């Protein structure tokens, strides 16, 4: 399969814009250039698509360093300045003219993992890596994920859903309902964001109102969810009709929980591969990972996140990431590396799975 042109889609309109650039840098560094011709496509925060020199300049940025030394707002301004007066690099969506044969989206969060970019690529008949439109949109929504998981016999944490209009019209009543149902600690989460953006761990009911306000600012649907005491583990799943699951990896958060800063800025979390669980639990996690992958109709790749509850040993699904991080500290490529599938081979397999996948 020589000289296949792969469009690397990165950036995007979500709050995970910078993380997408970091993932794209890793893919660019590890893709086999003797087999694939890389065509970078940078999507700015305002939705403009850039190719050529502009896309390559963004890809060359040390985003990790910028995020550590500056605020996200300052980094955003620098990215915006790089796209000013660069109309000659605007992409006109003529994929065929550019010779693009397959797309490799590393667009995390909204507009990337929710089925939107997948739908656009299907309109243009461009094969793409990862899950299809339906499974992407389902796994993006934490409530839908839980509903499908329960139907498949997979355990989930106790939760309730709060819709933004209901909360804004009935703040006191909804807060009282939450207080009666959940005892601290528990979580307040936007239903459709990733990388722990907007998540708050509630230790006291005094923190509830601010957490709900912030989550409602970010999403129209909010989850209130019981905090599970136990190990936080992840399983990498790869494949289409016959997926394989890695051994589980374990996250030991540096702070109260595995938040955005822990994941991408200070890297204070400790990762254990394999997870510190017995052989039986490890095998069950792999089985549950594949079961969840199939229950949500996933294809190509997904990272399945679980808790192993302290005391009971119950395996509880947390969430599914249809486009997991590909950064140097991301669990998905590290788990695949442990399974004997290096980064370059992983990219190759994902492209091959994209080309063989039957259209939805």
From Swiss-Prot:
One Pfam family this sequence matches: Dala_Dala_lig_N
Function: Cell wall formation.
Pathway named in the protein's UniProt entry: Cell wall biogenesis; peptidoglycan biosynthesis
Xref: InterPro entries: ATP-grasp, ATP_grasp_subdomain_1, D-Ala_lig_Van_CS, D_ala_D_ala, Dala_Dala_lig_C, Dala_Dala_lig_N, PreATP-grasp_dom_sf
Cofactor(s) required for function per UniProt: Mg(2+); Mn(2+)
Any GO molecular function: D-alanine-D-alanine ligase activity
Residues noted as binding ATP in the record, renumbered to the chain: 179-234
Protein name according to UniProt: D-alanine--D-alanine ligase
Chain positions recorded as Mg(2+) 2 binding sites: 319, 321
Assigned keywords, A-Z: ATP-binding, Cell shape, Cell wall biogenesis/degradation, Cytoplasm, Ligase, Magnesium, Manganese, Metal-binding, Nucleotide-binding, Peptidoglycan synthesis
ATP-grasp domain residues: 146-352
Similarity remark: Belongs to the D-alanine--D-alanine ligase family.
Catalytic activity: 2 D-alanine + ATP = D-alanyl-D-alanine + ADP + phosphate + H(+)
E.C. no: 6.3.2.4
Keyword Cytoplasm among UniProt keywords: yes
Binding locations of Mg(2+) 1: 305, 319
GO cellular component: cytosol
Top EC class for this record: ligase
Cofactor note: Binds 2 magnesium or manganese ions per subunit.
Transmembrane portions of the chain: none
Source organism (scientific name): Chlorobium phaeobacteroides (strain BS1)
